[in-house]
C-alpha cells in the first residue's frame, strides 16, 4: 500500500494560513529500494556553528563585478543538488533541492526538506553516482535552514555579501528541482521584501514548484541572495526565499 504523505511545515505556513492560502511544500513521491542505514545523529542548531562549518564562501573582489548572461547563470546548476529524503525503510518521503556552500561536502537546504529523514540521497549534475548520508550538521526550525554533508569535494556558489542593497524590480534566477525535474532554471524579479515571524524573506516572481525548496535564488552576478522556501498556490508567481542574511548567520 502507498505510504501516507507527511505534511511538512515551513516558516511561511503561519503567515499563509492567516491569509487562507495554501503554501507549497515538497512532494512525497513513490518508493525506492530498501537501503540499510544508521540512525541520524542528533542535529545541532544553527547557533552551534563550529569552526569547520562556519566558513561559507563570500565572493570578494576589488574589481568591478560584471553581470552574467542567463546562459552563464544556468551553468551554476552544477552547484545545486537534488535531495531525496528517506525513511528507515528506504522509502522516499520527500524531495527538495540544496546548494553547495563548502568544498568539503556541505549542502544547505530548507529544514522542512531535511526534517523527518532517516537518511538522504543526493544527486549532482553531470555525476552518475548517488551520494547517501545521515549527517545533519546543523538545523534551525525558525529560519528553516539545515546543512547536510556528503562525502564529496564540491564546487560552492558564493553567497551575496550584502554590500549593495537589494531592490524591488531587480532581476533574479532560480535554480532547483520542481516536481523532481532536476535543476530547472527560471527567471523573474524581486517583487518585495517580507518579514515573517522575524525571518527576513525575499518575495520573487521566478516560477518554482514542489521540490524547489532549498534551491538557489541568484542575482545577476551569480551570487546566492536567497533560498527558495515556499510559494502560494492561489497566487500567480508569489514565491518566498529565505534572505541571504539568515544564510550567513
Range-by-range predicted roles:
Residues 82, 102, 108, 173, ...:
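Hydrophobic beta-strand signal
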Residues 99, 207-228:
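Catalytic nucleophile loop of clan PA
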Residues 97-99, 133-135, 184-189, 216:
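Residues located in well-ordered beta-strands
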Residues 56-60, 65-73, 155-156, 178, ...:
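C-terminal cap/linker of serine protease catalytic domains
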Residues 185-197, 242-243:
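Short, compositionally biased
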Residues 6-7, 11, 17-100, 106-110, ...:
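N-terminal activation segment of mature serine protease catalytic domains
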Residues 102, 110-115, 176, 186, ...:
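Short beta->alpha transition motifs characteristic of CBS
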Residues 87-93, 102-176, 180-183, 198-201:
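Conserved active-site neighborhood of the chymotrypsin/trypsin-like protease fold
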Amino acid at each position: 500500500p502507498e505510504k501516507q504523505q507527511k505534511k511538512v511545515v515551513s516558516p511561511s505556513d503561519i503567515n499563509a494560513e492567516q491569509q487562507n492560502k495554501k503554501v507549497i511544500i515538497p512532494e512525497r513521491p513513490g518508493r525506492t529500494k530498501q537501503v540499510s542505514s544508521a540512525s541520524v545523529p542528533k542535529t545541532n542548531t544553527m547557533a552551534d556553528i563550529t569552526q569547520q562549518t562556519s566558513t561559507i564562501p563570500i565572493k570578494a573582489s576589488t574589481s568591478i563585478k560584471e553581470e552574467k548572461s542567463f546562459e552563464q547563470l544556468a551553468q551554476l546548476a552544477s552547484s545545486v543538488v537534488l535531495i531525496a529524503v528517506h525513511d528507515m525503510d528506504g522509502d522516499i518521503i520527500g524531495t527538495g533541492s540544496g546548494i553547495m556552500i563548502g568544498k568539503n561536502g556541505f549542502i544547505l537546504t530548507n529544514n522542512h526538506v531535511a526534517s523527518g529523514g532517516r537518511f538522504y540521497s543526493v544527486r549532482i549534475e553531470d555525476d552518475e553516482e548517488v551520494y547517501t548520508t545521515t549527517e545533519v550538521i546543523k538545523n534551525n526550525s525558525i529560519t528553516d535552514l539545515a546543512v547536510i554533508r556528503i562525502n564529496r569535494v564540491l564546487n560552492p556558489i558564493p553567497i551575496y555579501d550584502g554590500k549593495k542593497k537589494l531592490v524591488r524590480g531587480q532581476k533574479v534566477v532560480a535554480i532547483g528541482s520542481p516536481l523532481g525535474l532536476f535543476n530547472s532554471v527560471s527567471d523573474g524579479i524581486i517583487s518585495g521584501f517580507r518579514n515573517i515571524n522575524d525571518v527576513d524573506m525575499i518575495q520573487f516572481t521566478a516560477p518554482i514548484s514542489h521540490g524547489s525548496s532549498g534551491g538557489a535564488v541568484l542575482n545577476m552576478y551569480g551570487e546566492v541572495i536567497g533560498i527558495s522556501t515556499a510559494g502560494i498556490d492561489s497566487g500567480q508567481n508569489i514565491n518566498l526565499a529565505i534572505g541571504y542574511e539568515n544564510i550567513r548567520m
